[in-house]
Amino acid sequence: MTVRKNQASLTAEEKRRFVAALLELKRTGRYDAFVTTHNAFILGDTDNGERTGHRSPSFLPWHRRFLLEFERALQSVDASVALPYWDWSADRSTRSSLWAPDFLGGTGRSRDGQVMDGPFAASAGNWPINVRVDGRTFLRRALGAGVSELPTRAEVDSVLAMATYDMAPWNSGSDGFRNHLEGWRGVNLHNRVHVWVGGQMATGVSPNDPVFWLHHAYIDKLWAEWQRRHPSSPYLPGGGTPNVVDLNETMKPWNDTTPAALLDHTRHYTFDV
């Protein structure tokens, strides 16, 4: 069984293996396919039209399946690798070990945002940005520039306390747990972290930055925490809702799974705590 660990507790060898698996997926072109998929759904998901990966109830099950597919790709390179998660409510500093040269590298330089250290820096030659929104072919970050503070644990707890999963109009204007976690309403959790990291993370091609996977692994963990706190609160909508994915409706692009099939993460992996 795969165990997803807090990135702050990873050993040097676990970090090395995770980075090596990322670099191998990048080298073979498999990594960029995930970036392409994510960007296509960002562009296609709209408040008043069909929406699957974002701005909708299926934000959480869609990303759970997306991360599962990516984790399986990593494990096809190295079976020992699991997706770590980044608890940004606790690990809040630009000086965190997450941003060290032996792991993800740090923030970008002021001139153009280019990440200058670590295995994903352009100077290392192993991480060209091929699926992009502009002409820049290097990984960019601007930690803490777009918004100064990451969400706090108190803000996380305020969202976890919400007892209703989602509600009409089932988009970025909805009340409920999903939309507050996604960050369109209230204290702004998920979206704020993308903006805090900056660079490609603040765009539809956000998976270009490997921290995307650690961020979304934590979002997934928060969904699991919410489920434990509210065992009688179901995924909504249950059925008959236009433009969004109901409980037993198949999700694109896979068309072989439903939100109902993804409610129990323990069939696939557990978390360290």
From Swiss-Prot:
It comes from the Bacteria. The keyword ATP-binding does not apply. It catalyses: 2 L-dopa + O2 = 2 L-dopaquinone + 2 H2O; L-tyrosine + O2 = L-dopaquinone + H2O. One of its GO terms (molecular function) is tyrosinase activity. Cu cation A binds at H38, H54, H63. The keyword Metal-binding applies. PROSITE patterns: TYROSINASE_1 (PS00497), TYROSINASE_2 (PS00498). Its EC number is 1.14.18.1. Its cofactor is Cu(2+). One of its GO terms (biological process) is melanin biosynthetic process. This is a copper-containing oxidase that functions in the formation of pigments such as melanins and other polyphenolic compounds. This is Tyrosinase. It comes from Streptomyces antibioticus. The lineage of its organism: Bacteria, Bacillati, Actinomycetota, Actinomycetes, Kitasatosporales.
